[in-house]
């Protein structure tokens, strides 16, 4: 077959077309340190940002190494097909098309904020709260038109889409904006890390880097199922007659007839615990102007799954939440929401999928003899009985410089008392606040501080619980394109299950200090 004469023009044209694209690439680098799993690692990172048209691509190419020069291998693991997939996905910080509110918008990668509708199920969800300890690559998309709006999200493609949800809203029903939402977490255990790929999460795996073993009852470094283990529970009494036992001469010995064994850990490939929910909302716009609007709305949600009674351990079906009346308004630089809320039968939480969800999704406690017990967020909903109350939120843009946001949720009703071992009448309150610098001031390039305290009798006592998270971000310019970036986040885990936060082992700090530069 005759080859075209001008085929040589193809690479030339490709090179010409690539010049404008390459000229738009923003090459960014960073050096510094970061805390991962309680250990400080040095980092060298390249983060190019590639904009073209409505598209934007940001990569995150980073190497972590410790003081001995050991490289943190999780980000560069090519040991299996699954590891290769996750390693390649990790390099994407985001791929974006358009912006929220556009006719078509999509973003793959880091999700800093996701809301569905008025937020009865999903409000301020983020998959970045454990970054860089956990790098999640999710999806958020919108399809907007005059008659119908579609939006959805996925938390992480690396866990093969564990959490996902969506909402469809339309004005074709009675001429009012009506929305239908659905959210599902197909396996709440998928948020647990499994380094060796044996299906047993690290927190329950006594050999997190060896996929052949996972249980070591006495903690002597020899697995219970290892032929070399002759005293499983470490009580000094031989479990079996075996010539491989050091010093064994064939003489009769007393055998252990009461061997304590740790329980088998869950297998992420076989064990699952899902939860689902759906919601319906209806709005009614009262006033619609450029700088002033007021709307009324109502919404109801039903959660589908099983929780447990905190006293008896009885399995109970999840409940529903109802907002009979809500008000949404915008006046100038301020936005305001007010809701009257009801939980008729308990076993429900408003804004269940929130900023803390990836941390609260599965908790663990250490019992006697270091026995690990996992508790999903769903399993703890049994401590909430019938409740009523209100919710208020204010977002204020203070000129072009600052944005302040605060919300307060005040419910009253039946709540389980750990000390009295019964349901009592008490308050259930939530407080969230954040302050963000929108425009650089002198050498301060950006700044943000936030605090969240959920589901406590009084959030203004500022007593830390598992529902607390706080942090800040700060960027200071030093000239010549150099910026010092400081990020700090603190959350908490009740490791011993006593209902209180105490000690460093129940505090989770994530700190990143780096100097970034552009070239």
What annotation goes with each model-predicted range?
Residues 2-11:
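Bacterial N-terminal signal peptides that target proteins for export
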Residues 10-20:
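Bacterial N-terminal signal peptides
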Residues 25, 39, 69-71, 102-105, ...:
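Signature for the C-terminal beta-barrel architecture of outer-membrane proteins
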Residues 463-487:
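C-terminal structured "cap/appendage" subdomains that terminate the fold
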